[in-house]
């Protein structure tokens, strides 16, 4: 049984790897004999005792080789190996006997590997510069009935081949290390834009082991901000020019937390919503990281420290497991409206004339329209030309109506649409026939739930209007 100190060292390695996502890099070297090649892969894996029914079944460990340089195709687009010759990669997971089940089936690519118990041997013949073309495949680990919190082991990867100098790699495995699920949030009844959401943030450690130190990360899109300045939090407001960027707060908590236990904040975390906010995205997560090491990482960034009282973690006597998940997100507020407005023009023209017609698009607010959940895809409106006319020039973001469409053109408006946005779409129309009061229109062919004034969702385009037209 490993010592508590050894287990905590493993926990620290796992947590920092998950938080910082660091990767080792090697400078390019001139090829020489023997060719130096490194085995690549994660440094550690925290094997969960928590069986998520919706969890991934993909390998947690992806292995590869890294050789000097980068792959460069020739003039025909063909990339050639920098070494050709037999070599063997040996993956030894013997120390995981009784700790975890090991699946080598995704290892070795089309060649596959020969497996003897918990040892896999994989042959190869080519090595390319860099690592993109040197993937070895994946290893899947799963807990068994014998697995227990605190069990440790490792996977040792070595390789050998003539003319090659390999550097091996070791993946440390810890069973049941700290695994923090986040409390799900809900918008309060009657919540409106401009209100402050007192977010009851918290986590549940479903790992069998406790830990020392927690990092809280909170982020929010343009309509959200964090008005408090807690003394153990660091803040990075959104760049005003980055409309789809996020504000972020990072909070560090000292002290130990237990396994199979839930914790909340000593006071709610306030999230201020702007008057234009609508379906803005808030997300947060707790990560097990030693406080001193978290502060070292923060010192390398641009976050500014808070100056108020410190937040604290409070152990909760009871917590419904169903109220916690790996991802915690909330869209707030859901109650607000925008006012999209389409306008046309009234013009006079003779037969054969070509006229410019401006279709105006505006948002009179109060809310912006961002469509954050759909990746900022554009919205569209339809255009029917006045009878007796032909479009000679069409705005860049407009397309002819497709088969089955009733509109002559569809125009696309990129999002986000700000709360005071205005845009103009100019068509060139040739008058083929003079028709009194020839009327077209620009309109939205669908209903928008948060539209505050549907009455101005269409605008008329009138050529040669009569006094009564």
Task: Describe the predicted segments one by one.
Residues 1-32:
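Secretory targeting and sorting signals
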Residues 28-58, 65, 101-116:
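Low-complexity, acidic Ser/Thr/Pro-rich repeat tracts that form intrinsically disordered stalk/linker regions
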Residues 32-34, 82-126, 214-258, 333, ...:
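A surface/secretory-pathway sequence property marking extracellular, secreted
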Residues 63-69, 141-143, 159, 202-205, ...:
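Hydrophobic beta-strand positions in extracellular immunoglobulin-like domains
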Residues 41-85, 187-210, 343-375:
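Short beta-strand elements of extracellular/lumenal beta-sandwich folds
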Residues 124-150, 253-282, 290-294, 413-439:
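Low-complexity, intrinsically disordered segments enriched in Ser/Thr together with acidic residues
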Residues 202, 214-216, 236-243, 248-367:
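Acidic, serine/threonine- and glycine-rich low-complexity intrinsically disordered segments
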Residues 31-37, 145, 155-181, 285-342, ...:
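Extracellular/luminal low-complexity Ser/Thr/Pro-rich, glycosylation-prone repeat/linker regions
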């Amino acid at each position: 049984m490993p010592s508590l100190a050894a287990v905590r060292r493993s926990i620290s390695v796992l947590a920092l790897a998950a938080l910082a996502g660091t990767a080792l890099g090697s400078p390019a070297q001139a090829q020489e004999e023997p060719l130096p090649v490194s085995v690549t892969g994660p440094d550690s894996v925290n094997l969960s005792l928590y069986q998520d029914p919706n969890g991934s079944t993909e390998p947690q460990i992806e292995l590869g080789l890294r050789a000097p340089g980068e792959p460069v195709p020739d003039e025909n687009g063909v990339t050639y190996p920098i070494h050709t010759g037999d070599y063997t990669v040996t993956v030894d997971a013997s120390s995981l006997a009784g700790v975890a089940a090991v699946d080598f089936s995704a290892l070795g690519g089309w060649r596959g590997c020969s497996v003897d118990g918990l040892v896999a041997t994989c042959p190869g013949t080519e090595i390319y510069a860099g690592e993109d073309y040197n993937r070895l495949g994946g290893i899947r680990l799963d807990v068994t009935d014998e697995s227990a919190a605190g069990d440790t082991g490792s996977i040792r990867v070595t390789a050998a081949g003539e003319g090659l100098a390999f550097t091996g790699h070791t993946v440390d495995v810890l069973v049941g290390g700290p695994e923090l699920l986040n409390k799900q949030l809900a918008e309060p009844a009657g919540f409106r834009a401009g209100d402050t959401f007192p977010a009851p943030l918290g986590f549940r450690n479903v790992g069998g082991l406790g830990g020392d130190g927690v990092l809280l990360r909170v982020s929010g899109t343009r309509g959200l901000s964090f008005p408090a300045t807690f003394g153990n939090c660091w803040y990075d407001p959104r760049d005003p020019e980055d409309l789809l960027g996020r504000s972020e707060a990072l909070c560090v908590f000292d002290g130990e937390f237990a396994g199979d236990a839930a914790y909340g904040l000593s006071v709610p975390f306030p999230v201020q919503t702007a008057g234009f906010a609508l379906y803005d995205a808030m997300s947060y997560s707790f990560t097990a990281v030693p406080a001193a090491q978290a502060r070292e990482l923060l010192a390398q960034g641009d976050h500014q420290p808070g100056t108020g009282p410190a937040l604290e973690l409070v152990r909760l006597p009871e917590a419904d497991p169903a109220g916690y998940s790996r991802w915690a997100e909330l869209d707030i507020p859901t109650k607000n409206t925008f006012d999209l407005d389409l306008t046309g023009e009234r013009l006079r023209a003779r037969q054969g004339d070509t006229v410019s017609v401006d279709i105006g698009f505006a948002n009179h607010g109060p809310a912006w329209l961002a469509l954050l959940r759909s990746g900022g895809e554009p919205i569209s409106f339809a255009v029917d030309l006045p009878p007796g006319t032909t479009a000679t020039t069409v705005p860049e973001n407009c397309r002819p109506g497709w088969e089955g469409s009733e509109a002559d053109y569809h125009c696309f408006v990129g999002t986000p649409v700000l709360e005071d946005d205005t845009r103009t779409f100019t068509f060139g129309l040739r008058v083929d026939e003079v028709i009194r009061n020839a009327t077209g229109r620009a309109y939205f062919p669908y209903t928008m739930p948060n539209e505050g004034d549907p009455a101005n969702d269409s605008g008329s385009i009138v050529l040669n209007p009569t006094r009564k037209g």
